[in-house]
Each structure stands twice: as C-alpha cells, then as structure tokens.
C-alpha cells in the first residue's frame, strides 16, 4: 500500500551518494556519509547545525564504537578504519583491518553492527555496469582464540546491501541491489557465534518498484528498505509481506535510519545523480518521515 505521507526536508545536503545514516542519542544528532566525496556529515536536530569532515578515502559505512567517545568504525576503500573528527574539518583514520579485494576499483559499501557489536560490511566493484560477482560480505569481531579478524562470510555478490538485524538479533537480512539480482535474503543468526545459516529469499524485489538499497528494522520487527530508482521506502513484515510504501521527493533514496528523541522519525538519505535534476532538485538531500512506529537504537561496535 502506497501512502501519501509528506516527507520533510531535513537538509538540502546535495550529497552525491548519501549513505549510512546513524542517529546518536547522546548528541541528538544524525550522522551520515557521502561516499565519493569522502565526507562524514552531522546534523544537530535542535539547532539545525550542519558539520562536514573530509577524509583521504571514500567513506561508505559507519557504526559508533563503544568505549571510544566520538569514534566510529568505518568501511572505506581499502578496509576498516577507526575514524574521528578533527577541528580542522578533516578525519583522523587509524587502520584496523585491510580487505582482500578480488580486483581493482573496489570499496566497501553497506555495513553495520549486529546486536552483539560485531561489524558486518560488504564490498563491491565501483563499476556496477560490469556486474562482476566479486563482492564479499565480511564480519569483523574480536576472537579470543584467534585474535581480531576480518573474515569473509559471503562471496560472489555484486552489490551487497540492506544489512540489518531483527530486534532479538536472531534474524539477519542481506540484499543484493544490482539490477540483475534485486533480492533480499533472511538468515537464522546465531548470536553467540555470529554465524548466519538457513539462507532463504525474504523478498524478491524484481516485481516491486525500486531496487533494494539500505535498510533498517523497527521495534515491531518490520524491515524498512529504500526502493532506489522509485522514490519509495518500503516496509515489510517479518514474514516478508509488503505492509506499505512511503514516498520521498527524489528518485534515489539510499538508506534509512530511525532517530529523534523517541526514535519515531525515519531519516532517509539520498543520491544526487548527474544530468538534469529539474524534476528532483532536492536529490542528495536528507528527509524525515513519521510513520507512526518506533525504531531501535543503533548497536555499537564492541572492539
């Protein structure tokens, strides 16, 4: 069911590829990245203040790091880094683990932590038209037996996306947003070992409007995913049934995240493609929807 709920413009950020929105309750602020610009953005809800920091590599996905005030774990071009903001508008980046990319021209893409603080992130070939199945999905955790390690869990993907976890952490979601795939999978997830199993098709997005991009899970266990190219954000029940679709005034919503004091605002980042934007002048902006449900706090990385 498509609803006519009005999306509110939060910020006309003009991001080339706005991704990985994360709400920080301690700051009452929304963070996100602009991948090709190598930038981390922050918007304070109370004041509307907008800050930007620029790094040395493309910045694709972020998750807050527990016990390290102001620090993030980030998936970038060459691997995982711990990043922090500097007063001069730059990002300090300390390497954690390098990624064994299958070919040149790859970077990290979508990523987040599970409920236990393990970091999950996928890699992709930036030349999407090539449709090379060289993408991997990695898990990073501190292993008491083998030490901290970045290990591939899935291979032969094109554009891994849509990572999310159910409220109890026992279901993991993953998609491939390439036009040739457009599928969301669900897995049973062992919260003790961080091992997914029982892979099954959760939603085949090919008959639906939009390619599956970034995602979030609400407190009811429903799965929200941006319908890239369709200007929609879809909500699916835990059984994979389409519950509703909310419109945003851009063609390429990229990822969504719940935030606000009550976690009842759904923030949506977007992509600003090249070419004529007369029909979507706000492309690359950040939007807010109030869908009448609450989200969950974003898990922190625990390493």
Question: Locations of the language-model features?
Answer:
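Hydrophobic alpha-helical segments and helix pairs
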Residues: 90-153
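Conserved beta-strand positions in repeat-built beta-propeller and related beta-rich domains
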Residues: 24-25, 30-35, 72-78, 119-131, ...
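Beta-rich, blade/repeat-based domains predominating
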Residues: 13-27, 56-75, 101-118, 154-171, ...
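A short loop-to-beta-strand structural motif that recurs across blades of beta-propeller domains
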Residues: 39-41, 79, 135-138, 183-185, ...
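A short beta-strand motif characteristic of beta-propeller blades
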Residues: 6-12, 48-54, 94-101, 148-155, ...
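Blade-level signature of beta-propeller repeat domains, shared across WD40, Kelch, NHL, RCC1
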Residues: 258-303
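Short loop/turn segments immediately following beta-strands, especially the blade-tip
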Residues: 84-89, 142-145, 186-195, 291-296
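Loop/turn-rich, solvent-exposed surfaces of beta-rich toroidal or solenoidal domains
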Residues: 187, 203-241
């Amino acid at each position: 069911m498509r609803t006519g709920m009005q999306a509110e413009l939060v910020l006309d950020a003009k991001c080339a590829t706005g991704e990985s929105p994360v709400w920080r309750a301690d700051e009452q602020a929304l963070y996100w990245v602009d991948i090709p610009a190598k930038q981390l953005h922050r918007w304070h809800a109370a004041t509307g203040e907008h800050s930007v920091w620029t790094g040395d590599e493309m910045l694709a996905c972020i998750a807050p790091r527990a016990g390290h005030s102001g620090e993030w774990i980030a998936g970038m071009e060459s691997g995982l880094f711990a990043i922090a903001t500097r007063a001069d508008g730059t990002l300090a980046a300390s390497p954690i683990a390098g990624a064994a990319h299958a070919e040149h021209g790859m970077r990290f893409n979508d990523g987040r932590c599970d409920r236990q603080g393990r970091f999950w992130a996928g890699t992709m070939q930036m030349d999407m038209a090539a449709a090379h199945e060289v993408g991997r999905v990695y898990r990073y955790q501190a292993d008491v037996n083998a030490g901290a390690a970045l290990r591939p869990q899935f291979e032969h993907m094109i554009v891994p996306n849509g990572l999310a976890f159910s409220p109890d952490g026992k279901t993991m979601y993953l998609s491939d947003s390439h036009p040739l795939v457009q599928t969301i999978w669900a897995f049973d997830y062992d919260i003790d070992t961080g091992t997914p199993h029982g892979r099954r098709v959760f939603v085949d997005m090919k008959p639906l409007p939009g390619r599956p991009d970034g995602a979030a899970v609400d407190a009811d266990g429903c799965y929200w995913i941006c319908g890239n190219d369709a200007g929609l954000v879809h909500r699916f029940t835990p059984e994979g049934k389409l519950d509703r679709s909310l419109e945003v005034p851009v063609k390429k919503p990229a990822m969504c995240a719940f935030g606000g004091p009550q976690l009842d605002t759904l923030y949506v980042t977007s992509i600003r493609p090249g070419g004529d934007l007369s029909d979507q002048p706000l492309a690359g902006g950040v939007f807010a929807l109030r869908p009448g449900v609450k989200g969950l706090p974003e898990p922190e990385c625990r390493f």
